[in-house]
Amino acid sequence: MGQDTDMLNTYQQLVRTPSVRPGQDVRLQAPGTRTGLLKLLSTVSQDKQGCLGSGDGVPNQDLQQRSQSSRQTAKKDRKPRGQSKKGQGSEESEDHFPLLPRKPSFPFQWAWESIATDVRAVLQPSSPTPGHQALPMPSSFSQRQSRRKSTANLPEAHGCCWKTEAQNLKARQQLGAWGGVSIPTGKGELGSEPPSGLQLPGRRPGSGSASDKQVQLQSLGAEEAERGLSSGVLPQRPRRGSISEEEQFSEATEEAEEGEHRTPCRRRAGCQRKGQISGEEASDEGEVQGQSQGSSPSFNNLRRRQWRKTRAKELQGPWDLEKLHRQLQRDLDCGPQKLPWKTLRAAFQASKRNGKAYASGYDETFVSANLPNRTFHKRQEATRSLLQAWERQRQEERQQAELRRARTQHVQRQVAHCLAAYAPRGSRGPGAAQRKLEELRRQERQRFAEYQAELQGIQHRVQARPFLFQQAMQANARLTVTRRFSQVLSALGLDEEQLLSEAGKVDREGTPRKPRSHRSMGVRMEHSPQRPPRTEPTGSQPDRHYNPSLDPECSP
């Protein structure tokens, strides 16, 4: 009876202890699952608790049947999550205990029954003295401690897998509440060491060594269950019978170490894949960086070399015109219908060996592109037209290059001819200056002779028209004499018109006739617009005019 009171006090302490700790994350604890469960367990009557305090650690038949039904219900709930295997302990218990209909009970009673059955399975192989047997810490409490440590020590550098874990947080909490088994929420939870054990008050330090080992074994079993759930396999309970406690502890430790090595490797591989993707995105700028933690430099060098080879092949590309030209010539030689299937298969295998099949769906594309169907003929015709256009372009470029070369040679020949014409043969001799001076004098004499010939031509042209020149000179002389005669008459005070009329009368009466030329010239002068009354402006007329004025008959 005292042991029952001690167990009740222990569970009341466990109820109060996690609720007052300040560092506990309230979000990771579903309301009403564990704290309410332990409160309800603390109020269970003494006859229900008497079966646990009997000293042998084995519950009664009713508790075994209800725990068996609760395990079956929990396994049915876990089956939709991808777990199809069953534990060995459940198969043995199904053989021994028949299935009975479940009695109505308080909420989450089956969770506590599974915890009690796990405790019984752990305590059965080695049971020390009944009076000093320590009650192991429940897996829910160790789970809360490990989860609190993991959430407190979770590094920010491992944020690559945080989105996926945050999305499945509700599912993990629900699964942990059903089976009392936690699922790791990050890398820090697997890496954190489980608590060594909970020493109950009032016990001696030496008497709790077996309970410490059992608590460590239970925490390692919880971690193994977490790893099994994460890998998709049901956790198996420790085998009963001839296996001792030390063998169980060593096996659990080895499995825990292997699981801790496997899980970071898996996560490291996922981070490496993310790093490879980000490195391929940054490879266009020439920066290949490994985003994963723990990736070796040799792996980065290998990735860089592979990327360079792929990049070189992509730069070489399928549009190598020489290769297309050769392939087109082969197709034209053998014909599209004569292309055998073995040649297609050999070409396909060669392309796969060369690494040209980048995607998984490239195989069908390659086969359908090389089969002699309508698409193949259209593609071949397009390739042929492309090659013909390329050949025409190359021929035009060749012709233009030849034309440019011929034009350049012609210009060079002209320049050489001009230089040879302007540079005398012996221009580099000792008498070059004298010869140059003689050449200049010869050119000057030649130019002077040309000028003299031009002047002689002008003179010959003037002499060929003498009448025109004479008429011009006579007209100029006549105008000058008439102007002078008018000035003299005006100075003497004589009337020019009266004098001209009298002179005309005298001329008609007795003067001999003058030459025809003079008369004609006088007539022309009378009809001139300047002085119409003037007649016969010859040199003998003034003497004839002055003579009558000197005559005594005409004098006043």
Curated annotation (Swiss-Prot):
Coiled-coil portions: 379-464
Species, as recorded: Homo sapiens (Human)
Official protein name in the record: Testis-specific protein 10-interacting protein
Gene Ontology process terms (BP): cilium organization
InterPro entries per UniProt: FAM161
Superkingdom of this protein's organism: Eukaryota
Polar residues bias spans: 1-16, 208-219, 289-301
Region (Disordered): 1-31, 50-102, 123-155, 179-309, 503-556
Biased segments, Acidic residues type: 244-258
Family annotation (PANTHER family): PROTEIN FAM-161, TESTIS-SPECIFIC PROTEIN 10-INTERACTING PROTEIN
Keywords from the UniProt entry: Coiled coil
GO cellular component annotations of the record: cytoskeleton; photoreceptor connecting cilium
Gene: TSGA10IP
